[in-house]
UniProtKB/Swiss-Prot annotation:
Pfam families: MatE. One of its GO terms (molecular function) is xenobiotic transmembrane transporter activity. It is found in: Peroxisome membrane. Keywords: Membrane, Peroxisome, Transmembrane, Transmembrane helix, Transport. Expressed in the vascular tissue of all organs. May function as a multidrug and toxin extrusion transporter in the export of IAA-conjugates from the cytoplasm into peroxisomes. The chain crosses the membrane at residues 32-52, 61-81, 110-130, 143-163, 178-198, 206-226, 274-294, 305-325, 346-366, 373-393, 417-439, 446-468. This is Protein DETOXIFICATION 54. GO terms for cellular component: Golgi apparatus; peroxisomal membrane; trans-Golgi network. CDD domains: MATE_eukaryotic (cd13132). One of its GO terms (biological process) is xenobiotic detoxification by transmembrane export across the plasma membrane. Coiled coil: none annotated.
Length: 510
């Protein structure tokens, strides 16, 4: 009977019905909406920091903006990228009910991020000499270096915050993350006001407020995991008859040799994930730099700043879709349901195209009004409005390609996304942007046509990799190898957790 049930699981949803599609839609958006809200709150926190920097003066705003850009490129993008390497491991471990691997992977990622924070901190400490070497204004550089120095503790908070987010999302725990983020961001505004306007700490006050806000998020998330008993429930078998005590598992999981011994395999997943995210993230910063070489650099850089803020806001939905579909795909593969994983991927891609189309619509219809929200300076307003439809078209490609990258991470293939981003953004987008903006003298819009070409190449490549090059049954076998065959014996026989796949596929793994 057990063989029959697991065989049915393996082939379930092979030909999905409409009710199954609707069920998947509900399950996906039950995760996506809280994560989108959380992303929007994080976006609001960043805007609040910039607003308080602006209250201090133009020098402080310029220095803070320079430092924020530098920390994003050298620090936060790396932290987020490495932490995303947890997605296939944790989601597939959760799907296969390998609670030990789930928790141990979280510990390993914290160690990896702690190691990564050391060279990053050296870069942040030496921001001043680096910027002066690159020819930046000394006054702006001094302000940026001051902000960066006081933001250093945020590296430590992110070594816990980023892995915790992936760890919880992989287990479909999304609403608590939203509420914890809301509580932390609610403190962000009064904290900035108190440090900047009352205590007159200036730029350091803005940096410290951001650090404290992230620290509050970490404390709340750790508190939730502890109070909810999630960790104890997971490692004790979650009511499935596991006889392992929490003490025994924690004792084994804390083994230094065991912890360090698994860093290599996790790094092999984390590094490509990091490259895939960073390559795209960094390209937007390159656009800002290229804007500084146009005929009217001040106008171009100002317009670029507004447009990147706009794309960051629009990115909150596809980023949530990517993270949640990664968890859904990983969960189903880990549970031995490859066709349900395929359904989750297809439903998420369909949603991504709808979101992209909505972005095209509003950027065309509301382009003048949106530009007017940021500036009353007519030349800047006209420039931003003229490029808004191009940005909308970019999102038509960005939404499905970001979601597709999430699917690839869920299947444990982040290297494919990294290769696609490298080729699309740097071997397609950059030459097109430079050629149109500088050689053909199209100017500012040429840079964004470069982004459009990059997104077009990226979405075609990602969709091909997901829709045409994914062997879902094979990915289920790989998920079994990743989770079941790596499970340590903790009070039960390893073989009891192996998925009962067909003999040929199981034989290939064993």
């Amino acid at each position: 009977m057990e063989d029959k049930i697991q065989s049915d699981d393996f082939t379930s949803h092979k030909n999905p019905t409409l009710p199954q599609v609707i069920e998947e839609l509900k399950e996906l958006w039950a995760m996506v909406l809280p994560i989108t809200a959380m992303n929007c709150l994080v976006y609001v926190r960043a805007v609040v920091s910039v607003l308080f920097l602006g209250r201090l003066g133009s020098l402080e705003l310029a220095g803070g903006a320079l430092s924020i850009g530098f920390t994003n490129i050298t620090g936060y993008s790396v932290m987020v990228g490495l932490a995303s390497g947890l997605e296939p491991v944790c989601s597939q471990a959760y799907g296969s009910k390998n609670w030990d691997l789930l928790t141990l992977s979280l510990h390993r990622m914290v160690v990896i991020l702690l190691m990564a924070s050391l060279p990053i901190s050296l870069l942040w400490i030496n921001l001043g000499p680096i910027m002066l070497f690159m020819g930046q204004n000394p006054e702006i550089t001094a302000t940026a270096a001051e902000y960066c120095l006081y933001a250093l503790p945020d590296l430590l908070t992110n070594t816990l915050l980023q892995p915790l987010r992936v760890y919880l999302r992989s287990q479909r725990v999304t609403k608590p993350m939203m509420w914890c983020t809301l509580a932390a961001v609610a403190f962000h505004v009064p904290l900035n006001y108190w440090l900047v306007m009352v205590k007159h700490w200036g730029v350091p006050g803005v940096a410290i407020a951001s650090v404290v806000t992230n620290l509050i998020m970490v404390v709340l998330l750790v508190g939730y995991v502890w109070v909810s008993g999630m960790l104890q429930k997971r490692v004790s078998g979650d009511g499935d008859g596991g006889s392992t005590t929490m003490v025994a598992v924690v004792a084994q999981s804390s083994s230094v040799m065991e912890l360090v011994g698994g860093l290599g395999p996790l790094m092999r997943v984390a590094v490509p994930s990091c490259l895939g995210i960073c390559l795209e993230w960094w390209w937007y910063e390159i656009v800002i730099v290229m804007g500084g070489y146009l005929e009217n650099p001040k106008l171009a850089v100002a317009a670029t700043g507004i447009l990147i803020q706009t794309t960051s806001l629009m990115y909150t939905v596809p980023m949530a879709l990517a993270g949640c579909v990664s968890a859904r795909v990983g969960n189903e593969l880990g549970a031995g349901r490859p066709y349900k994983a395929r359904l989750a991927a297809n439903v998420a891609l369909a949603c991504a195209f709808v979101v992209g189309a909505l972005n095209v619509a509003w950027t065309v219809i509301l382009k003048e009004r949106w530009a007017g929200l940021f500036t009353g300076y007519e030349p800047l307003k006209v420039l931003v409005a003229s490029v808004m439809p191009i940005v909308g078209l970019c999102e038509l490609g960005n939404c499905p390609q970001t979601t597709g990258c999430g699917i690839l991470r869920g299947t444990g293939r982040p290297a494919v996304g990294a290769h696609v981003n490298l080729g699309s953004f740097y071997f397609v987008g950059t030459p097109v942007a430079v050629g149109l903006a500088f050689w053909l003298k199209i100017g500012f819009s040429g840079l964004w046509f470069g982004l459009l070409s990059a997104q077009a190449a990226c979405v075609v490549s990602i969709l091909y990799a997901v829709l045409a090059r994914t062997d879902w049954e094979g990915e289920a076998v790989k998920a079994m190898r990743l989770t079941s065959l790596e499970m340590r014996k903790v009070g039960q026989d390893e073989e009891s957790s192996l998925l009962l796949l067909d003999d040929e596929k199981l034989g290939d793994v064993l």
